[in-house]
Amino acid sequence: MKQKTLTLTQLYREGAKCLGDAGIGDAALDAWYLLEYVTGISKAMYYADPDREISEKNVKRYETYIEERSRHIPLQHITGEQEFMGYSFYVNEHVLIPRQDTEVLVEEALKVIRPGMRILDMCTGSGCILFSILKMEKERYYVSNLEGMGVDISKESLAVA
C-alpha cells in the first residue's frame, strides 16, 4: 500500500479549505500557523521550497490539528501555548487565553509598582500577569526585591501556572 505524500503547498491548501468550510474566520492564517507549528518551517523556507514533501507523521499531526480547529477549538489550546508580553506561556482549556488587551494591565502596573512591594494575583490562571510583572521589573532594575503570589480556586489552573 502506497503512503500518502503531500507537499507543503498541498497540505496548506487542504488545511485552509477545511477551515474555511468550517466557518473559521482566519482560515488561511490559522492553517499557516498550524503548518508552521507542525513542520517548523518558516514562511521564507516555504516560499523557497513549496513542493517539499511532508512526512506521513507530520501530515497526520497537521490533519488532526486542522480537524480540531475546524471544531472551533482555539489555536492556543491545540498548540498549548500563547505569547504574552514577549514570553511564551503554557495554556490549556482550564485557563483563559492571555490576550493582548491584558498587556495594558501589566504596563500600567509597572508604572506604579515600587521596589519591595508584594503582589497578590487573584485568579491567576496561567500566571502570565504576575510572571510578566516580576520578570519585567527584574529586567528593568537587574535586581528586584518584589514578591508575588498567584492564587486560584481551580486546581487545574494552578497546575498550569
What residue spans do the PLM features occupy?
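A short N-terminal interaction module
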Residues: K2-Y62
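A general structural signal for well-ordered alpha-helical segments in protein cores
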Residues: Y12, A31, Y62, H72-L75, ...
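Secondary-structure transition/hinge residues
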Residues: G20-G23, T39, S70, I113, ...
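Conserved AdoMet
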Residues: E36-V112
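Conserved SAM/SAH cofactor-binding pocket of Class I
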Residues: E103-A161
